[in-house]
């Protein structure tokens, strides 16, 4: 009995504390906040996130309360942006104000205390790492120079599918291996020995770095922080990550040269680490954080987009036939096509854009409002977490006819691109924090997809129809398929 009374007392004290803090914070909020659903004591709107993926639930909220909505998730105030107009104002007009990131337990542990580029705060460290990344890895010249790597890895992938003719094969797994190898060879000069384990860690980490952990939403609660079991799971994952990256970096130190016979980006980072004139020191943790960035943003997003493109084409056989017909006409007689040849295939570009519209690599883009400002007439308080619902914008009937339908032909009538200028379609973000690797990523999607459509006829496993396909997504920062894509390849015979 005494124990029960003690627990009740503890719960009452904790609840009273949170209620008091919520009222104190609410009293300091400006009056002209965006619309908000009714909320509960202590948890605010947290209960509304039950029963679905965050991007789906948040779309329902903004459809009811407006494209800009204010939410209290635990202790944390957030604003959801779900329109092209509000997103343009935040990411273009007020870009410096919204260029920051907020912390999460997942990003702090797995991305080395946000000492990377993706999750870094908007500061000199971020500017320095991004500049190195763009100049040494992601310039248009470098993207073109990686053509032979794409050709090598595509040849390997084609051999894998040729050896499985007529047999169901896990296409998701093989495409992920190919994407991983391309990025490793381009960035680091060789394929990592443990790249499979690293790819698995990336998928797991992206699923746990969304910022929706209870400890993320109640940052002042030492008890929830202590009881956050995912934190201990993440620390075990981080130890495995350290073991892999430490081994790779040690091998890198003793090797003489990479695939290109000269410096790769790791060599550049090590050279700059020794430069005493750098305003911001480059630490070993920063180098490891950058490597994990390359994997999480470079391999997972390209592989996921190819898998979704094939999934949508398999679900829409008439679109698949049209895409294959154009690819085979444009690439006829060409061996080892790369970016220059694929650029001529208009319908393929439309397929990729339509895939990115329906399945953006990062459905919710996290930002942090640095100082109080106004967006579409509403006041956004300083330090408010911003969630740009890219997934919802891409399915908004105000911008897209039949928005939930996969229809690449829509781009014959609608001139929109994915490079951050058209805010109805921003799968790579926009503004100064737009994904620096978008051209590299697009090349690593379009070239492999073209070759897979050129060389093979694709069928679903026996007894399965397009209507039976599971198009569910996995929870987390990225939006990969929940279940692997299983297909049956048959070699295309041009003379038949």
Swiss-Prot record:
InterPro entries: CYP450_71D, Cyt_P450, Cyt_P450_CS, Cyt_P450_E_grp-I, Cyt_P450_sf. It catalyses: alpha-terpinene + 2 reduced [NADPH--hemoprotein reductase] + 2 O2 = carvacrol + 2 oxidized [NADPH--hemoprotein reductase] + 3 H2O + 2 H(+); gamma-terpinene + 2 reduced [NADPH--hemoprotein reductase] + 2 O2 = carvacrol + 2 oxidized [NADPH--hemoprotein reductase] + 3 H2O + 2 H(+); (4S)-limonene + reduced [NADPH--hemoprotein reductase] + O2 = (1S,5R)-carveol + oxidized [NADPH--hemoprotein reductase] + H2O + H(+); (4R)-limonene + reduced [NADPH--hemoprotein reductase] + O2 = (1R,5S)-carveol + oxidized [NADPH--hemoprotein reductase] + H2O + H(+). Its main location: membrane. Heme binds at residue 435. The monoterpenic phenol thymol is widely used as a fragrance and a flavoring ingredient in food and cosmetic industries. Its derivatives have also several biological and pharmacological properties such as antimicrobial, antioxidant, anticarcinogenesis, anti-inflammatory and antispasmodic activities. Medical applications include the treatment of disorders affecting the respiratory, nervous, and cardiovascular systems. It may also act as a growth enhancer and immunomodulator. GO terms for molecular function: heme binding; iron ion binding; monooxygenase activity; oxidoreductase activity, acting on paired donors, with incorporation or reduction of molecular oxygen. GO terms for biological process: response to insect; terpenoid biosynthetic process. It is a single-pass type II membrane protein. The chain crosses the membrane at residues 1-21. Residues 471-496 are annotated as: Disordered. Its cofactor is heme. GO terms for cellular component: membrane. It is an enzyme of class 1 (oxidoreductase). Optimum pH is 6.8-7. Belongs to the cytochrome P450 family. Involved in the biosynthesis of phenolic monoterpenes natural products thymol and carvacrol which have a broad range of biological activities acting as antimicrobial compounds, insecticides, antioxidants and pharmaceutical agents. Catalyzes the C2-hydroxylation of gamma-terpinene and alpha-terpinene to produce carvacrol. Also mediates the C6-hydroxylation of (4S)-limonene and (4R)-limonene to form carveol. PANTHER family: OS06G0641600 PROTEIN (PTHR47953:SF19), OS08G0105600 PROTEIN (PTHR47953). This is Cytochrome P450 71D181. It comes from Origanum vulgare.
